[in-house]
Each structure stands twice: as C-alpha cells, then as structure tokens.
A protein has these predicted regions:
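Glycine-centered helix-coil hinge/cap
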Residues: 21-23
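Solenoid-repeat scaffolds in large eukaryotic assemblies
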Residues: 54-55, 74
Length: 146
C-alpha cells in the first residue's frame, strides 16, 4: 500500500512549516491533536456500523490536517479511507475493504503525535533527573547494607 511507503513525517518540510507558523505552531499542534482524536473516533465508529458516508468527512479532515504537519503516512491512510469511502457511497457498497486501513490509523496517529511532540519540545524527551529535579534514589531498607 502507498501509505506504508510514505515517511511518517517529513522533518525538513515540517521545519519550514513551523518557521512559517511561528508562535502559533504549538497552539495549532494542540488543535491537530484534539481534532485527530475526534476524527479517528468517528472513523472507527463509522467502520463499526459499516457506514461509508460517515467515513468521508472525518477522513477528509484528518487527511488535510495531517498534510499541514507534513505527516505523510497518516495523510495517505486518511486519503485511502476517504477515497474508498466515496467510491463505496457511489457504488452503494459497504466499506469492509477498509478494515485493515482503519485499524492502522490509530497507531499511526499516536506515532505521529509522539514524533511531533518530541520535535516541538526536545527538552521533554530528555531523561528525568538532573538540575532542579530529584533523582529517585534506590530504596534501602533501614539498618541493612545495600
């Protein structure tokens, strides 16, 4: 499938987009996270009910928002869902062929968000501990040598 060959996120394009958005980047990223969770929930629910029509809008939304963050693999998955669902609506078919693609959507979204979060705040990816933080010491039992 095409989406499996796509990069998760094109970091070069993302750096360009991030520079253009400036201070608004983090706010827009938080909207993407919220909207993405809603879209995936709607897609999964539409798939459970085998409703091709209900797949189109959230897949279209997720496709566009993913593309804005250069998340090509997620955008390709969403595009596959959207286009197949549109065809199913036109042909009066159920979207059963999309089951594997829909199942792959949530893990891809989670992986994408983790990468975008690391990119947005590289300090958060550091190990806990260090200056200003307590480092958990090994628990020693009272009166016993370590």
């Amino acid at each position: 499938m095409l989406h499996q060959q796509s990069d998760l996120v094109d970091l070069t394009e993302l750096a360009r987009a991030r520079a253009e958005l400036g201070a608004a980047y983090l706010r827009i990223l938080s909207y993407f996270k919220e909207d993405g969770v809603k879209s995936i929930h709607e897609i999964e629910e539409a798939m459970r009910t085998r409703n091709a029509t209900a797949l189109v809008r959230p897949a279209h939304t997720l496709k566009g928002e993913s593309a804005q963050f250069c998340a090509h693999r997620l955008s390709a998955l969403a595009e596959t869902i959207e286009m197949t669902a549109r065809r199913c609506v036109e042909m009066h078919e159920t979207p059963d062929e999309l089951i594997e693609t829909v199942v792959a959507l949530r893990p891809c979204f989670s992986e994408t968000i983790a990468l975008l979060d690391r990119d947005a705040n590289p300090l958060a990816a550091r190990r806990p501990g260090g200056f200003g933080r307590r480092v958990a010491a090994p628990q020693a039992s009272f009166g016993r040598a370590g």
